[in-house]
Amino acid sequence: MAPRFSWSLATSWHALAILALWPASTLAGDKSAADYYVRELPGLPKNSPPIKMHAGHIEVTPETNGNLFFWHFQNNHIANRQRTVIWLNGGPGCSSEDGALMEVGPYRVTKDNALTLNNGTWNEFANLLFVDNPVGTGFSYVDTNSYIHGLNAMATQFITFLEKFFALFPEYQSDDLYIAGESYAGQHIPYIARAILDRNKSKSRAETWNLGGLLIGNGWISPQDQSSAYLKFSLERGLIEKGSDNAQQLQQMQRICDKEMSINPGHVDYPECESILNKILELTRVGSGDQECINMYDVRLRDSAPSCGMNWPPDLKYVGPYLRQPQVISALNLDKQRNTGWQECNSMVNANFRNQNATASISLLPDILKEVPILLFSGAEDLICNHVGTEELISNLAWNEGKGFEVTPGNWAPRRQWTFEGEVAGFWQEARNLTYVLFHNASHMVPFDYPRRSRDMLDRFMKVDISSIGGEPSDSRIDGEKGPDTSVGGAKNNTQQHEEETKQKLKEAQWLAYQRSGEVVLVIVIIAASVWGYFVWRQRRKGTAYSALQSDEAAGQSRTGLAAFHNRQSDRDLEAAAFDETTVDNIPLQESIGRGESKYSIGDDSDEEEGETNKT
């Protein structure tokens, strides 16, 4: 019976072990936050401040293998409250890694696949989340025949993405959430915002997402206003000479465009109107063989035809090779089997997404503005989504019981001059939850040109106040008024500071533990000494009694015996002779404690301290 019982016991323990491991093995196919951790990013400069990053794919449509790629950067500081900014680029079908590595992210790419720090990064006071949206864009992927066709489908998939993202990273779910982007993201962002607000209405308070605001730069929001602005902008800037044959030809094309928009108002795309932009680019060709045209993203520059700006900005030639490196693909936790190489813009996504019958996002703004503030900003040198169109959009828009920036009948909100570090940066204008910012001397990609100014704009919009964390603010003024301190110059990285404080507390706890260990050793030594002393005392009492029983003759020899007791070479009382009472007070208590303490390591002064984040 004994062997059978032993076998049963072993089997039982084995079964228990399997049961204990079953939940973990069941979930092994599901990713955790740790699976998305970016452990090392190739090309980082030496001694660069540490930034916690996560990246990878999140599945949004299992039936079509639709996965959205994200890249998340933790904030450098926490001022007032926790914030997260989602950044989206346009296209449709252009990767948000443009924004990550050429605009608002913490790094810029240089030659030789090296990274440098962006001194105007938007993750200074907010976590940054870049998403390649929609599926098929950038590092995102989907089955070839399953590209999405409309804005509502895009928004639905994005909500699925956010649900899964916050399940993986619940620490960010309660953040103030801002959605930012540029160009065609002017269609994506309002649709996503509306989907979030609709979702919130069906959720408990604990499950809602706190949508703090929207920021759209040089946005394609109102196709009608923007399509009418190509020619207006070109004439105002002298790209096309007023009254010329070219101007008359373009005016005829504009009439065709206007007629199409009147027949089908509210659509997103009008091919008849896009032909006006193409014609302007064609008419501006100069040089040998007409091989140069204006850059449609920055009219101060020229580019080779027919690109006319598609080769810009100059950092683009570094971004592609960097993102295609095997080491980078591995660092960003990309599925190597699904990765076909990063593309800035996917023409297949663009071709499938451009649905002429979709309703433009401008129609969503009035209702969104009832609940959420919106900031529109424009670089003054952009043609394709120029500031003239944005300003027309605002003038024609009715929201919150008013139209345009009219605050009272016949009285419009003033354009307030904005200066940044002693230079005129542009102007601010705001009314009834809508803000408009014009950046002088800036292109379609404002943060590329002015990273620190754009970050100052973001901080003002989010109502960041650095007074609680210290540092030197930048000199940013609107109509001469400085306002809250919004840009940091010398504050310590709060996330890093928290880790250092935790490390210090751990050292203190270790010291306390070692100190208590020393006290225990001291008590043990004292007890041992007491026991040893008692033992010696008993032996001496025995020796005294023994001597009293001896003959007078033996007693007469006691001095010799006493002398012999102190003589360690005597063999008269071997047990007593082994102990000298003069050594009782010389038990090395302090020496013992000292050696005990020397065995402990309570901290090394040479431990490296984490570097401070560059401040602006």
From Swiss-Prot:
Lumenal side: 29-516
InterPro entries per UniProt: AB_hydrolase_fold (IPR029058), Peptidase_S10 (IPR001563), Ser_caboxypep_ser_AS (IPR018202)
EC number: 3.4.16.6
Transmembrane intervals: 517-537
Region (Disordered): 469-502, 578-616
Topological domain ranges for the Cytoplasmic compartment: 538-616
Enzyme class: hydrolase
Membrane topology summary: Single-pass type I membrane protein
Glycosylation sites: N119, N200, N357, N433, N441, N493
Domain of life: Eukaryota
Signal peptide region: 1-28
Entry's localization field: Golgi apparatus, trans-Golgi network membrane
Pfam hit, one: Peptidase_S10
Keyword Transit peptide annotated: no
Active-site residues, record numbering mapped to chain: S183, D382, H444
Catalytic activity: Preferential release of a C-terminal arginine or lysine residue
Gene3D superfamilies: alpha/beta hydrolase
GO BP field: apoptotic process; proteolysis
Main location: Golgi
Keyword terms: Apoptosis, Carboxypeptidase, Glycoprotein, Golgi apparatus, Hydrolase, Membrane, Protease, Signal, Transmembrane, Transmembrane helix
Biased composition (Basic and acidic residues): 474-484
Molecular function in Gene Ontology: serine-type carboxypeptidase activity
GO CC terms of this entry: membrane; trans-Golgi network
Function per UniProt: Protease with a carboxypeptidase B-like function involved in the C-terminal processing of the lysine and arginine residues from protein precursors. Promotes cell fusion and is involved in the programmed cell death.
Family: Belongs to the peptidase S10 family.
UniProt protein name: Pheromone-processing carboxypeptidase KEX1
Taxonomic source organism: Metarhizium robertsii (strain ARSEF 23 / ATCC MYA-3075)
